[in-house]
Amino acid sequence: MTDTFSFNVNSDDLQKRSDHIKMGIHQAPARSLLYATGQVSNPEDMKKPFIAICNSYVEIIPGHVHLRELADVAKQAIRDAGGIPFEFNTIGVDDGIAMGHLGMRYSLPSRELIADSAETVITAHWFDGVFFLPNCDKITPGMIMASLRCNVPSVFVSGGPMKAGLDPQGKATTLSSMFEAVGAFKSGLMTEEEFLEMEQNACPTCGSCAGMFTANSMNTLMEVMGIALPFNGTALAISDERRDLIRDGAKQLMRMVKENVKPRDLITKEALDDAMALDMAMGGSTNTVLHVLSIAHEAGIDYDQADINEIAKKVPYLSKIAPSSKWAMEDVHNAGGVPAIINELIRMGDVLHPDRMTVTGKTLRENVADHEIINDEIIRKFDVNPYSKQGGLSILYGNLAPKGSVIKAGGVDPSIKDFTGEAIVFNSEQEAVEAIDSGQIHAGHVLIIRYEGPKGGPGMPEMLGPTSAITGMGLGKEVALVTDGRFSGASRGISVGHVSPEAADDGPIALVENGDKITIDLVNRTMHLHVDDTELAERHEHLKPFVPKMRNGWMARYQALVTSANTGGVLKGADELFPS
Protein backbone atom coordinates (compact mmCIF):
# COMPACT_ATOMS: atom_id res chain seq x y z
CA MET A 1 0.00 0.00 0.00
CA THR A 2 1.09 3.58 -0.54
CA ASP A 3 1.82 5.86 2.40
CA THR A 4 -1.52 7.52 1.82
CA PHE A 5 -3.41 4.26 2.41
CA SER A 6 -1.37 2.90 5.30
CA PHE A 7 -1.61 5.88 7.68
CA ASN A 8 -2.45 4.99 11.29
CA VAL A 9 -3.72 7.87 13.45
CA ASN A 10 -2.53 6.06 16.57
CA SER A 11 1.00 5.60 15.29
CA ASP A 12 3.80 6.79 17.55
CA ASP A 13 5.56 8.33 14.57
CA LEU A 14 2.69 10.63 13.67
CA GLN A 15 4.36 13.70 12.14
CA LYS A 16 1.60 15.99 10.96
CA ARG A 17 -1.73 16.91 12.54
CA SER A 18 -3.28 17.17 9.10
CA ASP A 19 -2.64 13.46 8.48
CA HIS A 20 -5.83 12.90 10.49
CA ILE A 21 -7.88 14.23 7.56
CA LYS A 22 -5.83 13.09 4.57
CA MET A 23 -4.06 9.80 5.25
CA GLY A 24 -5.37 6.24 5.41
CA ILE A 25 -7.91 4.39 3.29
CA HIS A 26 -10.84 5.70 5.32
CA GLN A 27 -9.91 9.27 4.42
CA ALA A 28 -10.33 8.71 0.67
CA PRO A 29 -13.60 10.73 0.63
CA ALA A 30 -11.83 13.60 2.41
CA ARG A 31 -9.02 13.47 -0.13
CA SER A 32 -11.56 13.68 -2.94
CA LEU A 33 -12.93 16.85 -1.37
CA LEU A 34 -9.44 18.25 -0.90
CA TYR A 35 -8.65 17.69 -4.59
CA ALA A 36 -11.87 19.55 -5.41
CA THR A 37 -10.58 22.67 -3.65
CA GLY A 38 -7.80 23.05 -6.20
CA GLN A 39 -5.27 23.63 -3.42
CA VAL A 40 -4.07 20.01 -3.59
CA SER A 41 -3.03 18.60 -6.98
CA ASN A 42 -1.57 15.14 -6.39
CA PRO A 43 -0.68 12.53 -3.73
CA GLU A 44 2.66 14.27 -3.10
CA ASP A 45 0.81 17.40 -1.99
CA MET A 46 -1.03 15.29 0.57
CA LYS A 47 2.29 14.66 2.31
CA LYS A 48 3.00 18.37 2.81
CA PRO A 49 2.01 20.40 5.90
CA PHE A 50 -1.44 21.97 5.63
CA ILE A 51 -1.26 25.60 6.73
CA ALA A 52 -4.29 27.72 7.58
CA ILE A 53 -4.28 31.40 6.74
CA CYS A 54 -6.68 32.96 9.21
CA ASN A 55 -7.51 36.19 7.42
CA SER A 56 -9.81 39.02 8.46
CA TYR A 57 -10.40 40.73 5.13
CA VAL A 58 -13.43 43.02 5.45
CA GLU A 59 -14.17 45.77 2.94
CA ILE A 60 -15.79 48.16 5.42
CA ILE A 61 -12.69 48.27 7.65
CA PRO A 62 -9.84 50.37 6.18
CA GLY A 63 -7.38 48.44 8.31
CA HIS A 64 -8.47 45.21 6.61
CA VAL A 65 -9.41 46.19 3.08
CA HIS A 66 -5.93 45.26 1.80
CA LEU A 67 -5.64 41.92 3.58
CA ARG A 68 -6.84 39.90 0.60
CA GLU A 69 -3.70 40.97 -1.26
CA LEU A 70 -1.47 40.28 1.76
CA ALA A 71 -3.00 36.81 2.11
CA ASP A 72 -1.99 36.08 -1.48
CA VAL A 73 1.59 37.04 -0.62
CA ALA A 74 1.47 34.73 2.40
CA LYS A 75 0.06 31.83 0.37
CA GLN A 76 2.80 32.04 -2.21
CA ALA A 77 5.47 32.19 0.50
CA ILE A 78 4.00 29.12 2.20
CA ARG A 79 3.99 27.20 -1.09
CA ASP A 80 7.58 28.24 -1.73
CA ALA A 81 8.53 26.91 1.72
CA GLY A 82 6.90 23.53 1.11
CA GLY A 83 3.43 23.93 2.60
CA ILE A 84 -0.13 23.88 1.27
CA PRO A 85 -2.04 27.05 2.25
CA PHE A 86 -5.79 27.19 2.89
CA GLU A 87 -7.28 30.61 3.55
CA PHE A 88 -10.37 31.21 5.65
CA ASN A 89 -11.86 34.42 6.97
CA THR A 90 -13.21 35.78 10.22
CA ILE A 91 -15.62 38.61 10.88
CA GLY A 92 -14.59 42.08 11.97
CA VAL A 93 -16.10 45.28 13.35
CA ASP A 94 -14.71 48.74 12.63
CA ASP A 95 -14.87 50.51 15.98
CA GLY A 96 -14.65 53.97 14.42
CA ILE A 97 -17.65 53.33 12.17
CA ALA A 98 -19.55 51.48 14.91
CA MET A 99 -18.94 54.28 17.42
CA GLY A 100 -21.80 55.99 19.24
CA HIS A 101 -24.71 53.73 18.28
CA LEU A 102 -25.99 50.15 18.59
CA GLY A 103 -23.08 48.85 16.52
CA MET A 104 -20.56 49.61 19.28
CA ARG A 105 -22.27 47.07 21.53
CA TYR A 106 -21.10 44.37 19.12
CA SER A 107 -17.43 45.39 19.09
CA LEU A 108 -15.98 43.76 22.21
CA PRO A 109 -18.28 40.71 21.89
CA SER A 110 -16.95 40.21 18.36
CA ARG A 111 -13.63 39.25 19.98
CA GLU A 112 -15.30 36.12 21.37
CA LEU A 113 -16.93 35.30 18.02
CA ILE A 114 -13.59 35.65 16.24
CA ALA A 115 -11.87 33.39 18.76
CA ASP A 116 -14.67 30.83 18.55
CA SER A 117 -14.84 30.80 14.75
CA ALA A 118 -11.07 30.57 14.27
CA GLU A 119 -10.86 27.78 16.86
CA THR A 120 -13.64 25.95 15.01
CA VAL A 121 -12.02 25.99 11.58
CA ILE A 122 -8.50 25.24 12.83
CA THR A 123 -9.56 22.35 15.07
CA ALA A 124 -12.08 20.81 12.67
CA HIS A 125 -9.51 20.55 9.87
CA TRP A 126 -6.40 19.57 11.85
CA PHE A 127 -4.13 22.23 10.37
CA ASP A 128 -0.41 21.83 11.01
CA GLY A 129 0.19 25.55 11.42
CA VAL A 130 -1.67 28.85 11.27
CA PHE A 131 -0.67 32.15 9.69
CA PHE A 132 -2.82 34.76 11.45
CA LEU A 133 -3.47 37.97 9.50
CA PRO A 134 -5.21 40.47 11.82
CA ASN A 135 -4.95 44.22 12.18
CA CYS A 136 -7.65 46.12 14.03
CA ASP A 137 -9.03 46.30 17.54
CA LYS A 138 -10.83 43.08 18.56
CA ILE A 139 -9.62 40.95 15.66
CA THR A 140 -6.04 40.74 16.93
CA PRO A 141 -6.82 39.61 20.50
CA GLY A 142 -9.55 37.30 19.24
CA MET A 143 -7.04 35.53 17.01
CA ILE A 144 -4.47 35.33 19.82
CA MET A 145 -7.12 33.73 22.04
CA ALA A 146 -7.88 31.18 19.31
CA SER A 147 -4.20 30.38 18.86
CA LEU A 148 -3.89 29.56 22.56
CA ARG A 149 -6.95 27.33 22.52
CA CYS A 150 -5.72 25.37 19.50
CA ASN A 151 -2.02 25.55 20.47
CA VAL A 152 -0.85 24.83 16.92
CA PRO A 153 2.38 26.43 15.57
CA SER A 154 1.35 29.98 14.70
CA VAL A 155 2.76 33.27 13.53
CA PHE A 156 1.07 36.68 13.48
CA VAL A 157 1.69 39.36 10.85
CA SER A 158 -0.66 42.33 11.05
CA GLY A 159 -1.87 44.50 8.20
CA GLY A 160 0.05 47.55 9.42
CA PRO A 161 -0.88 51.18 10.18
CA MET A 162 -2.08 53.79 7.71
CA LYS A 163 -0.21 56.99 6.99
CA ALA A 164 -1.13 60.04 9.03
CA GLY A 165 -3.49 62.53 7.41
CA LEU A 166 -3.27 66.31 7.19
CA ASP A 167 -5.52 69.01 8.61
CA PRO A 168 -6.29 72.27 6.74
CA GLN A 169 -3.16 73.86 8.27
CA GLY A 170 -0.96 71.00 7.04
CA LYS A 171 -0.48 69.41 10.47
CA ALA A 172 -0.48 65.62 10.80
CA THR A 173 -3.80 64.13 11.88
CA THR A 174 -5.20 60.79 12.97
CA LEU A 175 -8.75 59.56 13.45
CA SER A 176 -8.83 61.01 16.97
CA SER A 177 -8.25 64.45 15.42
CA MET A 178 -11.45 63.98 13.42
CA PHE A 179 -13.48 62.98 16.47
CA GLU A 180 -12.19 66.03 18.34
CA ALA A 181 -12.95 68.20 15.32
CA VAL A 182 -16.65 67.41 15.83
CA GLY A 183 -16.56 69.15 19.21
CA ALA A 184 -14.47 72.00 17.80
CA PHE A 185 -16.91 72.53 14.91
CA LYS A 186 -19.94 72.49 17.23
CA SER A 187 -18.21 75.03 19.48
CA GLY A 188 -17.45 77.36 16.58
CA LEU A 189 -13.70 76.74 16.75
CA MET A 190 -13.58 75.37 13.20
CA THR A 191 -15.28 76.49 10.00
CA GLU A 192 -17.47 74.17 7.92
CA GLU A 193 -14.95 74.31 5.07
CA GLU A 194 -12.09 73.31 7.37
CA PHE A 195 -14.21 70.56 8.89
CA LEU A 196 -15.15 69.00 5.54
CA GLU A 197 -11.59 69.24 4.24
CA MET A 198 -10.29 67.48 7.32
CA GLU A 199 -12.98 64.79 7.05
CA GLN A 200 -11.71 63.81 3.61
CA ASN A 201 -8.02 63.80 4.55
CA ALA A 202 -7.79 62.44 8.11
CA CYS A 203 -7.43 58.82 6.98
CA PRO A 204 -5.54 58.88 3.66
CA THR A 205 -4.63 55.20 3.12
CA CYS A 206 -5.59 51.69 4.08
CA GLY A 207 -4.26 50.37 7.38
CA SER A 208 -5.04 50.62 11.07
CA CYS A 209 -5.61 54.14 12.40
CA ALA A 210 -2.32 56.03 12.56
CA GLY A 211 -2.04 56.67 16.31
CA MET A 212 -1.35 54.50 19.36
CA PHE A 213 -4.91 53.33 19.48
CA THR A 214 -6.08 49.79 20.30
CA ALA A 215 -5.11 48.19 16.99
CA ASN A 216 -1.56 49.49 16.95
CA SER A 217 -1.20 48.91 20.68
CA MET A 218 -1.97 45.21 20.23
CA ASN A 219 0.14 44.92 17.08
CA THR A 220 3.17 46.36 18.87
CA LEU A 221 2.59 44.23 21.96
CA MET A 222 2.75 41.10 19.81
CA GLU A 223 6.35 42.00 18.96
CA VAL A 224 7.48 41.92 22.57
CA MET A 225 5.35 38.87 23.38
CA GLY A 226 7.37 37.06 20.74
CA ILE A 227 4.52 35.95 18.49
CA ALA A 228 5.15 38.52 15.73
CA LEU A 229 8.24 39.72 13.89
CA PRO A 230 10.15 42.93 14.69
CA PHE A 231 8.49 46.05 13.19
CA ASN A 232 5.11 44.27 12.96
CA GLY A 233 3.49 47.16 14.80
CA THR A 234 4.92 50.09 12.84
CA ALA A 235 5.75 49.19 9.21
CA LEU A 236 3.12 50.95 7.09
CA ALA A 237 0.32 48.94 5.48
CA ILE A 238 1.22 50.26 2.04
CA SER A 239 4.97 49.61 2.32
CA ASP A 240 7.17 46.98 0.69
CA GLU A 241 8.46 46.29 4.20
CA ARG A 242 5.00 45.03 5.19
CA ARG A 243 5.05 42.51 2.35
CA ASP A 244 8.55 41.43 3.36
CA LEU A 245 7.23 40.80 6.87
CA ILE A 246 4.51 38.59 5.37
CA ARG A 247 7.06 36.53 3.44
CA ASP A 248 9.43 36.22 6.39
CA GLY A 249 6.55 35.31 8.68
CA ALA A 250 5.54 32.47 6.36
CA LYS A 251 9.10 31.12 6.35
CA GLN A 252 9.31 31.28 10.13
CA LEU A 253 5.97 29.50 10.44
CA MET A 254 7.16 26.59 8.31
CA ARG A 255 10.21 26.29 10.56
CA MET A 256 8.01 26.38 13.64
CA VAL A 257 5.80 23.61 12.23
CA LYS A 258 8.89 21.45 11.72
CA GLU A 259 10.17 22.21 15.24
CA ASN A 260 6.67 22.08 16.79
CA VAL A 261 6.97 25.50 18.46
CA LYS A 262 3.51 26.40 19.73
CA PRO A 263 1.82 29.54 21.12
CA ARG A 264 1.82 28.31 24.71
CA ASP A 265 5.59 27.89 24.44
CA LEU A 266 5.89 31.61 23.74
CA ILE A 267 3.02 33.28 25.59
CA THR A 268 4.07 32.90 29.21
CA LYS A 269 3.56 34.99 32.34
CA GLU A 270 6.86 36.71 31.54
CA ALA A 271 5.68 37.46 27.99
CA LEU A 272 2.52 39.10 29.33
CA ASP A 273 4.55 41.13 31.82
CA ASP A 274 6.75 42.29 28.97
CA ALA A 275 3.70 43.16 26.87
CA MET A 276 2.37 45.42 29.60
CA ALA A 277 5.83 46.92 30.15
CA LEU A 278 5.98 47.94 26.48
CA ASP A 279 2.43 49.24 26.74
CA MET A 280 3.51 51.46 29.64
CA ALA A 281 6.53 52.72 27.71
CA MET A 282 4.36 53.64 24.72
CA GLY A 283 1.22 54.85 26.48
CA GLY A 284 -0.97 52.28 24.78
CA SER A 285 -4.72 51.95 24.75
CA THR A 286 -6.58 51.07 27.95
CA ASN A 287 -8.17 48.24 25.95
CA THR A 288 -4.88 46.37 26.14
CA VAL A 289 -5.66 45.65 29.79
CA LEU A 290 -8.87 43.88 28.79
CA HIS A 291 -7.13 41.93 26.06
CA VAL A 292 -4.04 40.90 28.01
CA LEU A 293 -6.31 39.62 30.78
CA SER A 294 -8.32 37.63 28.23
CA ILE A 295 -5.13 36.24 26.67
CA ALA A 296 -3.92 35.18 30.11
CA HIS A 297 -7.25 33.45 30.69
CA GLU A 298 -6.91 31.42 27.49
CA ALA A 299 -3.31 30.54 28.32
CA GLY A 300 -4.27 29.37 31.79
CA ILE A 301 -2.04 32.02 33.37
CA ASP A 302 -3.04 33.59 36.68
CA TYR A 303 -2.89 37.30 35.88
CA ASP A 304 -4.41 40.23 37.71
CA GLN A 305 -4.78 43.98 37.26
CA ALA A 306 -2.63 44.41 40.37
CA ASP A 307 0.24 42.82 38.40
CA ILE A 308 -0.20 45.52 35.78
CA ASN A 309 -0.04 48.30 38.36
CA GLU A 310 3.27 46.99 39.68
CA ILE A 311 4.70 47.05 36.16
CA ALA A 312 3.41 50.60 35.66
CA LYS A 313 5.28 51.78 38.74
CA LYS A 314 8.71 50.78 37.40
CA VAL A 315 8.46 51.33 33.62
CA PRO A 316 9.07 54.87 32.29
CA TYR A 317 6.96 56.49 29.59
CA LEU A 318 9.37 56.73 26.65
CA SER A 319 7.36 57.35 23.49
CA LYS A 320 4.31 59.61 23.51
CA ILE A 321 2.28 58.94 20.38
CA ALA A 322 -1.02 60.31 19.03
CA PRO A 323 -3.55 60.99 20.45
CA SER A 324 -1.23 62.12 23.27
CA SER A 325 1.20 63.91 20.92
CA LYS A 326 1.66 64.87 17.27
CA TRP A 327 3.64 61.72 16.43
CA ALA A 328 2.04 58.94 14.37
CA MET A 329 3.11 55.30 14.04
CA GLU A 330 5.19 56.04 10.94
CA ASP A 331 7.20 58.53 13.00
CA VAL A 332 7.88 55.87 15.63
CA HIS A 333 8.92 53.46 12.87
CA ASN A 334 11.40 55.96 11.46
CA ALA A 335 12.72 56.70 14.95
CA GLY A 336 13.74 53.06 15.47
CA GLY A 337 10.42 51.33 15.94
CA VAL A 338 9.38 48.99 18.70
CA PRO A 339 12.75 47.16 18.62
CA ALA A 340 14.50 50.38 19.68
CA ILE A 341 12.03 50.85 22.55
CA ILE A 342 12.47 47.23 23.64
CA ASN A 343 16.24 47.63 23.47
CA GLU A 344 16.01 50.72 25.68
CA LEU A 345 13.91 48.81 28.21
CA ILE A 346 16.41 45.95 28.18
CA ARG A 347 19.13 48.53 28.88
CA MET A 348 17.31 49.37 32.14
CA GLY A 349 18.20 45.91 33.39
CA ASP A 350 15.17 44.73 35.39
CA VAL A 351 12.11 45.56 33.31
CA LEU A 352 11.88 42.85 30.62
CA HIS A 353 12.63 39.13 30.32
CA PRO A 354 14.83 39.40 27.20
CA ASP A 355 16.01 35.80 26.99
CA ARG A 356 12.60 34.39 26.04
CA MET A 357 12.36 32.66 22.66
CA THR A 358 10.29 34.23 19.88
CA VAL A 359 8.87 33.30 16.49
CA THR A 360 12.16 34.25 14.83
CA GLY A 361 13.89 31.33 16.52
CA LYS A 362 15.95 33.89 18.43
CA THR A 363 15.51 35.47 21.83
CA LEU A 364 13.91 38.85 22.32
CA ARG A 365 17.34 40.25 23.16
CA GLU A 366 18.81 38.91 19.91
CA ASN A 367 15.90 40.30 17.88
CA VAL A 368 16.55 43.89 18.97
CA ALA A 369 20.30 43.91 19.65
CA ASP A 370 21.15 45.97 16.55
CA HIS A 371 18.26 48.44 16.83
CA GLU A 372 19.04 51.77 18.47
CA ILE A 373 17.01 54.94 18.91
CA ILE A 374 17.36 57.08 15.78
CA ASN A 375 15.33 60.09 16.94
CA ASP A 376 15.43 60.69 20.69
CA GLU A 377 12.67 63.26 20.53
CA ILE A 378 10.16 60.60 19.46
CA ILE A 379 11.67 57.74 21.49
CA ARG A 380 13.32 59.01 24.63
CA LYS A 381 16.05 57.41 26.70
CA PHE A 382 15.02 56.15 30.12
CA ASP A 383 17.93 57.83 31.92
CA VAL A 384 17.84 61.18 30.12
CA ASN A 385 14.37 62.65 29.66
CA PRO A 386 11.46 60.18 29.82
CA TYR A 387 8.00 61.72 29.64
CA SER A 388 7.47 60.30 33.11
CA LYS A 389 9.22 57.82 35.36
CA GLN A 390 6.11 55.67 35.47
CA GLY A 391 4.08 54.06 32.71
CA GLY A 392 1.27 55.45 30.60
CA LEU A 393 -1.53 53.35 32.17
CA SER A 394 -2.72 53.16 35.77
CA ILE A 395 -5.12 50.88 37.61
CA LEU A 396 -7.16 52.88 40.15
CA TYR A 397 -8.78 51.26 43.18
CA GLY A 398 -11.11 52.68 45.82
CA ASN A 399 -14.66 52.55 47.13
CA LEU A 400 -15.98 53.49 43.67
CA ALA A 401 -14.00 50.69 41.98
CA PRO A 402 -13.18 47.95 44.54
CA LYS A 403 -12.03 45.59 41.79
CA GLY A 404 -10.22 48.26 39.83
CA SER A 405 -10.58 50.75 37.01
CA VAL A 406 -8.24 51.92 34.26
CA ILE A 407 -7.00 55.34 33.17
CA LYS A 408 -4.62 56.24 30.36
CA ALA A 409 -2.42 58.39 32.59
CA GLY A 410 -0.22 59.24 29.63
CA GLY A 411 -3.22 60.89 27.98
CA VAL A 412 -3.83 63.21 30.93
CA ASP A 413 -2.22 66.65 30.98
CA PRO A 414 1.02 66.32 33.02
CA SER A 415 -0.02 69.21 35.27
CA ILE A 416 -2.94 67.18 36.65
CA LYS A 417 -2.01 64.97 39.61
CA ASP A 418 -5.51 64.68 41.04
CA PHE A 419 -9.00 65.89 40.26
CA THR A 420 -11.99 66.41 42.55
CA GLY A 421 -15.33 67.21 41.03
CA GLU A 422 -19.08 66.95 41.32
CA ALA A 423 -20.87 63.94 39.85
CA ILE A 424 -23.41 64.34 37.10
CA VAL A 425 -24.95 60.92 36.48
CA PHE A 426 -26.14 59.25 33.27
CA ASN A 427 -27.45 55.72 32.84
CA SER A 428 -26.35 55.50 29.21
CA GLU A 429 -23.81 56.99 26.84
CA GLN A 430 -26.57 58.53 24.74
CA GLU A 431 -27.91 60.50 27.72
CA ALA A 432 -24.41 61.86 28.35
CA VAL A 433 -23.87 62.85 24.71
CA GLU A 434 -27.18 64.73 24.66
CA ALA A 435 -26.18 66.57 27.84
CA ILE A 436 -22.80 67.52 26.37
CA ASP A 437 -24.38 68.71 23.12
CA SER A 438 -26.96 70.81 24.98
CA GLY A 439 -24.32 72.58 27.09
CA GLN A 440 -25.15 70.96 30.45
CA ILE A 441 -21.54 69.95 31.17
CA HIS A 442 -19.28 72.49 32.84
CA ALA A 443 -15.84 72.73 34.41
CA GLY A 444 -15.67 70.76 37.66
CA HIS A 445 -18.07 68.03 36.58
CA VAL A 446 -17.34 64.31 36.83
CA LEU A 447 -19.52 62.59 34.26
CA ILE A 448 -20.70 59.19 35.48
CA ILE A 449 -21.76 56.99 32.58
CA ARG A 450 -22.98 53.66 33.94
CA TYR A 451 -24.81 50.51 32.88
CA GLU A 452 -22.40 50.40 29.94
CA GLY A 453 -20.16 47.55 31.16
CA PRO A 454 -19.77 44.12 29.52
CA LYS A 455 -23.08 42.94 30.98
CA GLY A 456 -24.88 46.25 31.30
CA GLY A 457 -24.22 47.69 27.83
CA PRO A 458 -24.15 44.97 26.84
CA GLY A 459 -20.77 44.82 25.15
CA MET A 460 -18.92 47.53 27.07
CA PRO A 461 -19.11 50.22 24.36
CA GLU A 462 -16.32 52.76 23.88
CA MET A 463 -16.89 56.34 24.96
CA LEU A 464 -14.85 58.09 22.28
CA GLY A 465 -17.74 60.38 21.38
CA PRO A 466 -18.09 61.94 24.86
CA THR A 467 -14.34 62.17 25.53
CA SER A 468 -13.64 63.71 22.12
CA ALA A 469 -16.48 66.19 22.54
CA ILE A 470 -15.16 67.26 25.94
CA THR A 471 -11.64 67.69 24.55
CA GLY A 472 -12.89 69.46 21.42
CA MET A 473 -14.79 71.94 23.60
CA GLY A 474 -11.60 72.81 25.48
CA LEU A 475 -12.66 71.10 28.74
CA GLY A 476 -10.14 68.25 28.67
CA LYS A 477 -8.41 69.45 31.85
CA GLU A 478 -11.55 70.60 33.67
CA VAL A 479 -14.01 67.72 33.27
CA ALA A 480 -13.54 64.04 34.17
CA LEU A 481 -15.45 61.03 32.88
CA VAL A 482 -15.91 57.81 34.88
CA THR A 483 -17.61 54.77 33.38
CA ASP A 484 -18.02 51.02 33.61
CA GLY A 485 -17.74 51.11 29.84
CA ARG A 486 -14.43 51.54 28.08
CA PHE A 487 -12.56 54.00 25.89
CA SER A 488 -11.15 53.98 22.42
CA GLY A 489 -7.38 54.01 22.17
CA ALA A 490 -7.99 57.43 20.62
CA SER A 491 -9.43 58.81 23.87
CA ARG A 492 -7.51 61.15 26.15
CA GLY A 493 -8.19 63.39 29.11
CA ILE A 494 -9.28 62.51 32.66
CA SER A 495 -11.12 59.40 31.51
CA VAL A 496 -11.51 56.46 33.90
CA GLY A 497 -13.03 53.28 32.47
CA HIS A 498 -13.50 49.58 33.22
CA VAL A 499 -14.97 50.42 36.66
CA SER A 500 -15.47 47.07 38.39
CA PRO A 501 -17.82 45.75 39.57
CA GLU A 502 -20.04 47.33 36.93
CA ALA A 503 -23.43 48.87 37.67
CA ALA A 504 -25.28 45.85 36.24
CA ASP A 505 -23.54 43.72 38.89
CA ASP A 506 -24.58 46.12 41.68
CA GLY A 507 -21.19 47.80 41.75
CA PRO A 508 -20.81 51.04 43.76
CA ILE A 509 -20.95 53.07 40.54
CA ALA A 510 -24.69 52.25 40.51
CA LEU A 511 -25.06 54.12 43.82
CA VAL A 512 -23.58 57.48 42.73
CA GLU A 513 -26.00 60.41 42.74
CA ASN A 514 -25.85 63.88 41.21
CA GLY A 515 -23.76 66.21 43.34
CA ASP A 516 -21.62 63.53 45.00
CA LYS A 517 -17.96 64.49 45.22
CA ILE A 518 -15.42 62.19 43.57
CA THR A 519 -11.62 62.37 43.76
CA ILE A 520 -9.34 60.81 41.16
CA ASP A 521 -5.79 60.58 42.53
CA LEU A 522 -3.26 59.68 39.84
CA VAL A 523 -0.28 59.71 42.19
CA ASN A 524 -1.74 57.21 44.66
CA ARG A 525 -3.76 55.37 41.99
CA THR A 526 -7.07 55.71 43.81
CA MET A 527 -10.60 56.86 43.04
CA HIS A 528 -12.82 57.79 45.97
CA LEU A 529 -16.52 58.52 46.25
CA HIS A 530 -17.00 60.96 49.16
CA VAL A 531 -20.10 59.24 50.56
CA ASP A 532 -19.98 57.30 53.83
CA ASP A 533 -20.65 53.57 54.01
CA THR A 534 -23.94 53.99 55.88
CA GLU A 535 -25.37 56.21 53.16
CA LEU A 536 -24.15 53.83 50.43
CA ALA A 537 -25.78 50.88 52.21
CA GLU A 538 -29.07 52.75 52.38
CA ARG A 539 -28.87 53.61 48.68
CA HIS A 540 -28.15 49.96 47.89
CA GLU A 541 -31.38 48.90 49.64
CA HIS A 542 -33.36 51.04 47.21
CA LEU A 543 -31.39 50.05 44.10
CA LYS A 544 -33.64 48.62 41.39
CA PRO A 545 -32.58 45.23 39.95
CA PHE A 546 -30.80 45.37 36.60
CA VAL A 547 -33.01 44.42 33.66
CA PRO A 548 -31.11 42.93 30.67
CA LYS A 549 -31.53 44.98 27.50
CA MET A 550 -31.14 42.17 24.97
CA ARG A 551 -33.84 39.52 24.61
CA ASN A 552 -32.93 37.91 21.30
CA GLY A 553 -29.96 37.26 19.05
CA TRP A 554 -26.55 36.12 20.22
CA MET A 555 -26.05 39.27 22.28
CA ALA A 556 -28.72 38.00 24.69
CA ARG A 557 -26.55 34.93 25.28
CA TYR A 558 -23.47 37.14 25.58
CA GLN A 559 -25.15 39.30 28.20
CA ALA A 560 -25.94 36.18 30.25
CA LEU A 561 -22.42 34.73 30.03
CA VAL A 562 -19.98 37.66 30.06
CA THR A 563 -17.78 38.35 33.08
CA SER A 564 -16.49 41.62 34.51
CA ALA A 565 -13.88 43.93 32.98
CA ASN A 566 -11.41 43.10 35.74
CA THR A 567 -11.23 39.54 34.38
CA GLY A 568 -10.94 40.64 30.75
CA GLY A 569 -14.63 40.53 29.89
CA VAL A 570 -14.33 36.88 28.84
CA LEU A 571 -17.28 34.51 28.81
CA LYS A 572 -17.98 32.21 31.73
CA GLY A 573 -16.21 28.87 31.43
CA ALA A 574 -17.21 25.33 32.30
CA ASP A 575 -16.15 25.72 35.93
CA GLU A 576 -18.62 28.57 36.40
CA LEU A 577 -21.42 27.11 34.28
CA PHE A 578 -21.11 23.55 35.57
CA PRO A 579 -19.65 23.73 39.09
CA SER A 580 -18.71 20.37 40.56
From Swiss-Prot:
Record note on cofactor: Binds 1 [2Fe-2S] cluster per subunit. This cluster acts as a Lewis acid cofactor.
Catalytic activity of the protein: (2R)-2,3-dihydroxy-3-methylbutanoate = 3-methyl-2-oxobutanoate + H2O; (2R,3R)-2,3-dihydroxy-3-methylpentanoate = (S)-3-methyl-2-oxopentanoate + H2O
Residues the record lists as binding Mg(2+): D95, D137, K138, E462
InterPro entries with a match to the protein in the record: Dihydro-acid_dehy_C (IPR042096), DihydroxyA_deHydtase (IPR004404), DiOHA_6PGluconate_deHydtase_CS (IPR020558), ILV_EDD_C (IPR056740), ILV_EDD_N (IPR000581), IlvD/EDD_N (IPR037237)
Cofactor: [2Fe-2S] cluster; Mg(2+)
Transmembrane segments: none
Pfam families tied to this protein: ILV_EDD_C, ILVD_EDD_N
Pathway note: Amino-acid biosynthesis; L-isoleucine biosynthesis; L-isoleucine from 2-oxobutanoate: step 3/4; Amino-acid biosynthesis; L-valine biosynthesis; L-valine from pyruvate: step 3/4
Active site per the UniProt annotation: S488 (proton acceptor)
Keywords, comma-separated and alphabetical: 2Fe-2S, Amino-acid biosynthesis, Branched-chain amino acid biosynthesis, Iron, Iron-sulfur, Lyase, Magnesium, Metal-binding
Record NCBIfam families: ilvD, PRK00911.1
Oligomeric form and interacting partners: Homodimer.
Recorded family membership: Belongs to the IlvD/Edd family.
Protein name as it appears in the record: Dihydroxy-acid dehydratase
Species: Leuconostoc mesenteroides subsp. mesenteroides (strain ATCC 8293 / DSM 20343 / BCRC 11652 / CCM 1803 / JCM 6124 / NCDO 523 / NBRC 100496 / NCIMB 8023 / NCTC 12954 / NRRL B-1118 / 37Y)
